[in-house]
Amino acid sequence: MRRSVRNVITTAVLGVALVATTSPPASGQAVPAAGQAAAACAITWGSGDKAAGRLSSAPLVEVRAGRHACYDRVVFEFDGSATGYRVRYAAQVPTEGEGVDLVPYTAGGAHLWVTLLAPAYDENHEATIAGATGDHVVNVLRFDTLRDVVFGGSFEGYTTFAVGVRARLPFQVTVLPGPGTHSRVVLDVAHQW
């Protein structure tokens, strides 16, 4: 008798589970197609060096970060038109002017060496962003890929950052106009390959 009751209960539970996993969704409920989530994050950027633009006198005025569905983003905003950058993965990221390696002080399994072809100071040589060389300038707590953003200084019109990431992952760099007369150099680092 016990065996019969156990078999009936097991059969009933399996039947409910089968119906629950194979029944069509309720009206109006979205069902993603197979592979749709993976396709939505189909990143084709690669992890090779990226460089563009030219030297500008527009000062860097803000550094911020954001989380997105498929990537994490660092935004470098300038007061004026700035289009120049060099970004690459590196074993060492030297500070501007002194050459002190930032990697030992930057969290992450891999490090992007970001050089902006614009100063982080104005025409009077006053700093235009908060933070000194070696400071962690953006809070990236709970980000999927970003681990750290460290200011590497600004010297003779060049500004450096060490961006620590979870691992060597694809990235892209985009130059965007605005807001207003400002411009932005945007670094996106994918969550996965």
Regions found by a protein language model. Name each.
Residues 29-193:
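Short linear recognition/processing motifs and adjacent strand/loop elements at protein termini
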Residues 1-30:
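Secretory targeting and sorting signals
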